[in-house]
């Protein structure tokens, strides 16, 4: 499958709606060493003169190790027919399952990163910064309900 390269500003759909409602698979690593997980939190914007994507990966997640090890990652967005696969990838650990195989997803190399051939939108990202979440800095009490067990 071939993908058409577009500027992130030319994505027709709202990123907020895409990540909140459709979710995405975050894939970190290289073709022979990667993991994926479902993400439904994230944002796009402008920072330091660059178009950026921010994603949030808990340290307990297997994918976190890949995010630390590699400088690139992708976000793969899918049509609704893949919602069950995204649910699986969010509930199961790559330590225990080959998620791509379990969900019949085909990994493809994309500029040194990995994405899934079945995606209808892929955002290729380069890690430029990272920060740990500090719950003591939460200002709105409702956030705690989404920060399960402090992770």
Q: What is each PLM-predicted segment?
A:
Residues 1-151:
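Basic, polyanion-binding surface patches
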């Amino acid at each position: 499958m071939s993908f058409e390269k577009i500027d992130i500003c030319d994505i027709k759909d709202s990123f907020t709606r895409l990540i909140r409602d459709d979710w995405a698979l975050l894939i970190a690593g290289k073709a022979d060493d990667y993991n994926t997980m479902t993400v439904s939190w994230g944002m796009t914007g402008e920072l330091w003169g660059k178009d950026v994507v921010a994603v949030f990966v808990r340290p307990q997640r297997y994918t976190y190790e890949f995010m630390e090890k590699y400088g690139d990652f992708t976000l793969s967005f899918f049509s609704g027919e893949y919602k069950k696969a995204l649910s699986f990838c969010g509930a199961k650990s790559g330590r225990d399952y080959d998620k791509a195989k379990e969900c019949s997803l085909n990994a493809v190399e994309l500029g040194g990163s990995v994405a899934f051939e079945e995606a209808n939108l892929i955002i290729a990202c380069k890690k430029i910064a990272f920060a740990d979440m500090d719950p003591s800095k939460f200002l709105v009490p409702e956030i705690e309900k989404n920060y399960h067990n402090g992770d």
